[in-house]
Structures are given as C-alpha cells and as structure tokens.
C-alpha cells in the first residue's frame, strides 16, 4: 500500500503508474486508499456508478482504507521533498538515479551479487561509473505504454515540446495509451504539438514498449522511454533503454541527450 502526503498529492493517473510498478517490490498488487481525488476522477466516467447508484458506491469506497491501528509486516518512509525527476542507467527499473546525477559505481554495491548485476548492466548499456546522465546522447525517444501515456502525461510532454523541435537524428514517437485518450488529446490539439515538434503521432496500443508485433528500435540504439521496463532487448535487439517520465523524454528528444525537464532546452 502506498500512502502519505506525497502520494495524496498525486493525480489518479500518476498513482496508477506507481501501482503498476509494485511488482518491482516483489508485490502481487499495489493499492492507494481512495479519496476525493479518486471520486472526482470517477464521477461521470463510462462504467462508473451513476444516478441513485453513486452515493451507495461512494459510501462503500470511503470504507476501503487501512485502519489507523493496522499492523503491517513492514513500513517504509521516504522523504520526497527533494526528489528529482528520475532516469534509469541500467537494465532494471531499480537502476535509477536523479536526472542530474551520475552512473553509480558497482564497487559501492551492498554485496557481490548486486555488484555483478551492476557490472553486467553497465556493460550492456555501454556506460561507465561516474558518467553524468546529462552527457548521454540518445538515438530515439518514445512516449507510450500503459504506464505513462495517459492524457495528463501527454499534456506534460506537450508543455515541454511546445515551440521546440526534436533534435536532428533523433527518432521520436508518441503512442497514446488508448483510443479514448488519443481522441481526447486530439480534441485539445496535443497531437499538433507533437507533430510540429517532430514526433510521430501513432494509433494507441502497446507498440514498442515491448517489441510488440515485431516493431522495434534498431540494434544497439539508445532510447529514452516513458515505458515501465528496461530489460535487455525489451524494445528491440540489443536496444538500450533509459526509463524516464514523459516530460523528461520530451526534453531529451529536443536536446538529443538525456535532459532535465525542469530546465527545458532553450528555456
């Protein structure tokens, strides 16, 4: 279960991303207690209770939270006040650092197995310890998947791309998470922002999140991607994937290397 002020401040779509990655904690599922943010999100949506059914549903949903005296196997507290946008350097979602940070040194690993895994990841990704993330050039940028291509994600990326162009030599692709999201984005004109910046605007689907339908990036290409996994060859044969949020992917596409979305190129 994810809770606390940082989680409560997140919109529903960001909470979905958080729960999507719960398996990386070796969990079968991830939950966030429903609150007014969730109820407002559900109101009026297709398949949501409506009319006389709404209040009983709301009453039931308000009961779905952990009791104040609940006992958990383990509780972890994370101070998110100084949390920066993150990006991965290796071949697992856990291989993450701040976008303005550097590739870690395997010599600092907590045990031999972790050190070997880090060394293998660095070899595959063709990176070296201490290398600044901001110095890593990319070949492609991908915004898509069930994790980070909902409407709020597309708005975030479009905010970075507006008035800017994708760097020469960078392949940039956007795949909305669903047909409904694609239609909503087009109604807002977001598709024009992506196209004018140099992104391909494609039909919804899994696409190159996991090499679907044989579609992939090129051999050994380095891709910054808003997807949820960065395993070896996940996006193509020997493709090297850096996971990041949509705004980071957009900023990186413009700069041609991993970029901090808090300081957009040309801003």
UniProtKB/Swiss-Prot annotation:
Binding site for [4Fe-4S] cluster: 146, 206, 209
Any one GO biological process: L-leucine biosynthetic process
This protein's pathway: Amino-acid biosynthesis; L-leucine biosynthesis; L-leucine from 3-methyl-2-oxobutanoate: step 2/4
Catalytic activity entry: (2R,3S)-3-isopropylmalate = (2S)-2-isopropylmalate
Keyword field: 4Fe-4S, Amino-acid biosynthesis, Branched-chain amino acid biosynthesis, Iron, Iron-sulfur, Leucine biosynthesis, Lyase, Metal-binding
Pfam families tied to this protein: Aconitase (PF00330)
EC number in record: 4.2.1.33
Record's cofactor remark: Binds 1 [4Fe-4S] cluster per subunit.
Gene Ontology molecular-function annotations: 3-isopropylmalate dehydratase activity; 4 iron, 4 sulfur cluster binding; metal ion binding
Cofactor: [4Fe-4S] cluster
PANTHER family the UniProt entry points to: 3-ISOPROPYLMALATE DEHYDRATASE, HOMOACONITASE, MITOCHONDRIAL-RELATED
Similarity field: Belongs to the aconitase/IPM isomerase family. LeuC type 1 subfamily.
Subunit structure, interactors included: Heterodimer of LeuC and LeuD.
Function: Catalyzes the isomerization between 2-isopropylmalate and 3-isopropylmalate, via the formation of 2-isopropylmaleate.
Protein name: 3-isopropylmalate dehydratase large subunit
Record gene name: leuC
């Amino acid at each position: 279960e994810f809770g606390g002020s940082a989680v409560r401040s997140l919109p529903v779509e960001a909470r979905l991303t958080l729960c999507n990655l719960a398996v990386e904690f070796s969990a079968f599922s991830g939950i966030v207690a429903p609150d007014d943010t969730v109820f407002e999100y559900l109101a009026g949506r297709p398949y949501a209770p409506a009319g006389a059914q709404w209040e009983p549903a709301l009453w039931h949903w308000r009961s779905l939270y952990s009791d104040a005296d609940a006992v958990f196997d383990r509780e972890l507290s994370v101070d998110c006040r100084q949390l920066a946008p993150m990006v991965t350097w290796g071949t697992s979602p856990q291989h993450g650092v701040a976008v303005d940070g550097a590739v870690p040194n395997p010599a600092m690993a907590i045990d031999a197995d972790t050190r070997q895994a880090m060394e293998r990841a660095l070899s595959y990704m063709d990176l070296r310890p201490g290398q600044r993330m901001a110095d890593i050039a990319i070949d492609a940028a991908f915004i898509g998947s069930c994790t980070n291509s909902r409407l709020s994600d597309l708005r975030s990326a479009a905010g970075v791309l507006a008035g800017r162009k994708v760097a020469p030599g960078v392949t940039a692709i956007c795949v909305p998470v669903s047909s409904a999201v694609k239609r909503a984005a087009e109604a807002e004109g977001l598709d024009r922002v992506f196209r004018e910046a140099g992104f391909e605007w494609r039909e919804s689907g899994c696409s190159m999140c996991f090499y679907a339908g044989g579609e992939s990036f090129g051999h050994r290409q380095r891709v910054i991607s808003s997807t949820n996994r960065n395993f070896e060859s996940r996006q193509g044969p020997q493709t090297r994937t850096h996971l990041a949020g949509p705004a980071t992917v957009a900023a990186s596409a413009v700069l041609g290397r991993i970029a901090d979305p808090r300081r957009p190129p040309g801003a």
